């Protein structure tokens, strides 16, 4: 075949319809080529999914016991614990002129620990809310820093320790102080000294509760016996108190003995000049514990709310008996009931008690 020229009249072998078809084919091919060439440009504007960030899951920290976990991104271990408690109290004028009162408490504790060259660094915060009918109050129950035996902040003193039952009175009713303390520990033995702000403590007539106290304590465990001996001196009242406690596992339970002597009314002890107490916590079953107790007071103060005397002279004695029953319903759910009877020489006899339901976590 002869080569075809560009002019149509010199291509007699191609009809006009065939030429039109060839032109359309060329145009479609050109458009397709441009579309293919422009595809990368449009692809650059497309939305591309970002790579997912790595997730750091919470890790268990077992260096300080159960319940701790690492705060993400740190080497600090944190534990959250606490309890919910419902109580009903009964007794003469328990609340105002009423002989009974119900209340609910929420108690949450945050404990942070980390390793240092001086040993574990501990920080503790306890928030407590007490609900009584429609009124509630939240308080900072404890908050302190502890490292290498040194502790500073708001915390309960050694005087807050007592027998396992409920009715005994072996300390003042204010054992929570802003304090600085050093406690040496070696195995089952400890000894320490504490300087306490006794702002809410006992004060005499004509004075204000604004004083400082110094407390000493030693304690430990030897076999089936544990013990504690503490003393406190109230610098403003210029009086002091000493207390000893001992516990021994005997038979199906634990025997507890305690004694207190106070030189005069002070912020560490002001209920009486001296007292002795005994209890026996009987482990009846895995779930039941029954604890009877008895206590005798020499030179007993019947009403601490109104007493601001300079000494215990002239006061009568008193004796007290009581019983506490503890029952574990299920894991972390407990019930407690207690009742006690007090017979003072200088006041009316008193019978009171309470029932408690508590869920720990």
Task: Show the residue positions of the predicted features.
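N-terminal periplasmic/intermembrane-space "pro-region" immediately following the signal or transit peptide
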Residues: 2-81
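Outer membrane beta-barrel
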Residues: 67-200, 217-221
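Transmembrane beta-barrel strands of outer-membrane/channel proteins
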Residues: 84-88, 125-129, 152-156, 193-197, ...
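Gram-negative outer-membrane beta-barrel proteins
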Residues: 88-94, 116, 131-133, 158-162, ...
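Hydrophobic, lipid-facing positions within transmembrane beta-strands of outer-membrane proteins
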Residues: 104-108, 141-143, 148, 176-180, ...
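Repeated loop/turn-to-beta-strand initiation elements of outer-membrane beta-barrel proteins
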Residues: 117-120, 148-152, 188-193, 222-229, ...
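Detector for outer-membrane/organellar transmembrane beta-barrel domains
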Residues: 209-320
């Amino acid at each position: 075949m002869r080569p075809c020229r560009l002019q149509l009249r010199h291509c007699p072998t191609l009809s006009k319809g065939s030429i039109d078809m060839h032109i359309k084919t060329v145009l479609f091919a050109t458009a397709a080529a441009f579309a293919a060439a422009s595809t990368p440009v449009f692809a650059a504007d497309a939305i591309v999914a970002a790579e997912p960030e790595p997730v750091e899951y919470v890790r268990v920290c077992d260096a300080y016991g159960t319940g701790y976990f690492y705060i993400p991104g740190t080497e600090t271990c944190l534990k959250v614990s606490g309890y919910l408690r419902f109580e009903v109290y009964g007794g003469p004028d328990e609340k105002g002129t009423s002989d009974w009162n119900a209340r609910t408490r929420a108690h949450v504790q945050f404990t942070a620990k980390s390793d240092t060259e001086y040993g574990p660094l501990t920080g503790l915060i306890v928030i407590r809310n007490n609900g009584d009918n429609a009124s509630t109050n939240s308080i900072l129950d404890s908050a302190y820093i502890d490292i290498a035996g040194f502790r500073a902040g708001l915390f309960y003193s050694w005087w807050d320790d007592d027998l396992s039952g409920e009715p005994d009175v072996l300390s003042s009713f204010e054992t929570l102080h802003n304090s600085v303390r050093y406690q040496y520990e070696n195995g089952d033995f400890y000894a320490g000294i504490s300087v306490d702000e006794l702002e809410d403590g006992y004060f005499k007539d004509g004075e204000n509760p604004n004083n400082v106290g110094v407390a000493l304590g030693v304690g430990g465990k030897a076999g089936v016996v544990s013990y504690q001996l503490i003393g406190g001196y109230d610098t403003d009242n210029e009086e002091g108190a000493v207390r000893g406690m001992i516990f021994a596992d005997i038979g199906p339970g634990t025997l507890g003995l305690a004694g207190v002597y106070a030189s005069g009314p002070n912020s560490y002890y002001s209920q009486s000049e001296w007292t002795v107490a005994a209890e026996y916590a009987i482990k009846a079953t895995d779930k039941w514990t029954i604890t009877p107790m008895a206590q005798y007071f020499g030179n007993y103060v019947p009403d601490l709310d109104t007493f601001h005397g300079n000494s215990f002279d002239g006061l009568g004695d008193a004796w007290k008996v009581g019983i506490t029953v503890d029952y574990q319903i299920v894991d972390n759910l407990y019930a407690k009931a207690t009742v006690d009877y007090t017979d003072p020489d200088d006041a009316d006899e008193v019978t009171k008690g309470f029932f408690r339901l508590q869920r720990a976590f």
